[in-house]
Amino acid sequence: METAERVNLLGLDGAALSDLVGQWGGKPFRARQLQRWIHQRGADSFDAMTDLARDFRGQLAQQCRIQALPVNTEQRSSDGTRKWLFDVGQGNAIETVFIPEDDRGTLCVSSQAGCAVNCRFCSTGHQGFNRNLTSSEIIGQLWWAKRVLEADAGTARLGGAGNDDTRVVSNVVMMGMGEPLLNYDQLLPALRLMLDDNAYGLSRRRVTVSTSGVVPMMDRLSRDCPVALAVSLHAPTDALRDELVPLNKKYPLAELLAACERYLASAPRDFITFEYCMLDGINDTDQHARALIQVARQVRCKLNLIPFNPFPASGLKRSPSARVKVFAQRLMDAGIVTTVRKTRGDDIDAACGQLAGEVRDRTRVAQRNAGRTIPIAQVQA
């Protein structure tokens, strides 16, 4: 019972940790020391913090804890991608993915156990929704991955956070399970820790929040913690996006694009990334490309085309590679900066849209999906 009542320091940002230490009469520099031990050195025991006074360490041990989520499984892909399944209790589990590349190491972090947005092409959405993650559970994914990856690479650091080009985890994308902006109050302290020089010290350009288009929270993020922004677009018209991304019925394209333009005033990059999952016969025709060009010209953006990663419940197919290339070329010919995402980790179900974890659904999403009677292929561009 005592352990459950102790404060988990893992999810406290710098201000909250300073407030806590201040309640005990401690100086702000003590909070910074503590933060460096936890997030830069990966300490999970107060006894290891030898430059802190013994009495202070004793007080910490009595009233606080450093506790990440239990790891159920780890899988490794043939391409080097790694996926961890974290137990979040009551029969639920979330997934976190590390994607190594020559010039970076990207960690894909989850924000919810499941997702209530229920996008048609996303395995997480088909699992339904159980609960939001806490800030400790969000940042704990980075804390764990950093410890494990640096230990494996033999590069664990005893000093500062390093620079973005030398650390094992150089980029974080909030593109795992869940809609981050529907868990804003827990997301915000986690983002602040990612950016804090006494924690992970990542630049704002290297932390990306992906959203399906929660317009009010996009505005709040631009004020509170403007990091790079990616928007799950996936359709160039409201009619089609209503079917693919049901949140569009609440925040249609005109509102979403206006919010993107507002966000750019504070963004660390001079463009918004639009994510577009390529679905065979659904959103990949010449007509869709022409409509998408008109959308893209309204906001400074980059288009990221994502080959669909099939899963049984979707009833959808991946666009053929040749069609994806033609689609991308039409966008580029129109002057739209366009990339095609390379599929990584699909042999361990770690690719984009495949994360499902284990979710005890509280939203009866399967029943709602069964009630959809309009074949999506009939929706016109």
From Swiss-Prot:
Catalytic residues as annotated in Swiss-Prot or TrEMBL: 95, 352
UniProt keyword Phosphoprotein, yes or no: no
Cofactor binding, note field: Binds 1 [4Fe-4S] cluster. The cluster is coordinated with 3 cysteines and an exchangeable S-adenosyl-L-methionine.
Record localization: Cytoplasm
One GO cellular component term noted in the UniProt record for this chain: cytoplasm
Main location as per UniProt: cytoplasm
EC number(s) per entry: 2.1.1.192
GO BP: rRNA base methylation; tRNA methylation
An MF annotation (GO) of this entry: tRNA (adenine(37)-C2)-methyltransferase activity
Residue ranges of domain Radical SAM core in the record: 101-347
Keywords, ordered alphabetically: 4Fe-4S, Cytoplasm, Disulfide bond, Iron, Iron-sulfur, Metal-binding, Methyltransferase, rRNA processing, S-adenosyl-L-methionine, Transferase, tRNA processing
Highest taxon above the source species: Bacteria
Binding sites annotated in the UniProt record for S-adenosyl-L-methionine: 178-179, 210, 232-234, 309
One Pfam family matching this protein: RlmN_N
Cofactor: [4Fe-4S] cluster
NCBIfam families, alphabetized: rRNA_mod_RlmN
Described function: Specifically methylates position 2 of adenine 2503 in 23S rRNA and position 2 of adenine 37 in tRNAs. m2A2503 modification seems to play a crucial role in the proofreading step occurring at the peptidyl transferase center and thus would serve to optimize ribosomal fidelity.
Miscellaneous: Reaction proceeds by a ping-pong mechanism involving intermediate methylation of a conserved cysteine residue.
Protein name as it appears in the record: Dual-specificity RNA methyltransferase RlmN
Organism: Bordetella petrii (strain ATCC BAA-461 / DSM 12804 / CCUG 43448)
